[in-house]
Design a protein with these regions (language model features):
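PLP-dependent aminotransferase-like
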Residues: 1-29
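ALDH superfamily catalytic-core signature
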Residues: 34, 40, 46-167
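Conserved functional loop/turn residues at catalytic and ligand-binding sites
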Residues: 12, 36-37
Length: 167
């Protein structure tokens, strides 16, 4: 988001046309939602927060745009180009460290090609560079918060022996 704002300025957007506000929803978000000079709210996140925002915005007749809790499947059929599918599935799952609503959160694979696809997906994922998200060569950066880290860790632990964390 920060880079998008920088690029919009470089593209000639006047100052103040696009504003990216970072912070906790309970503080920064609430201030924006309740400010009389903010006519429109766009939010991407969880359904509980989205519902609360919709109620607050409706009371003030503010326009809203909500993208809530997307769960996007990535589907691989037997006739797919498995190399390309694995590369794209890894990219889809880990873009923005998997923390955006349009990331592939489920991969559905036709059983006849599952073993080959798994092997290729592991290779594609292993080839991704983990590091500073500000560096162009980085594919996977840090998680946004400790609470999100714990959520990811819990998801890994919840599947028990049917999944593995690989380095």
């Amino acid at each position: 988001a920060t880079r998008f704002a920088e690029l919009s300025g470089e593209a000639g957007f006047p100052p103040g046309v696009l504003n990216i506000v970072h912070g906790l929803g309970s503080e920064a978000g609430s201030a924006l939602v309740h400010h009389p000079d903010v006519p429109t709210i766009s939010f991407t996140g969880g359904t509980t927060t989205g519902r609360d925002l919709a109620v607050s915005c409706a009371k003030q007749f503010k326009r809203t745009s909500l993208e809530l809790g997307g769960k996007n499947p990535f589907v691989v059929f037997a006739d797919a180009d498995l190399d390309r599918a694995a590369t794209e599935a890894a990219r889809a799952a880990f873009s923005n460290t998997g923390q955006i609503c349009l990331c592939g959160s489920r991969i559905l694979v036709e059983s006849s090609v599952l073993p080959q696809f798994q092997e290729k997906l592991l290779a594609a994922t292993a080839a991704m560079r983990v590091g500073d998200p500000a560096e162009e060569k980085t594919h996977i950066g840090s998680l946004v918060s400790e609470s999100h880290y714990l959520k990811v860790k819990q998801a890994i632990e919840a599947v028990g022996g049917s999944a593995a964390l690989r380095k």
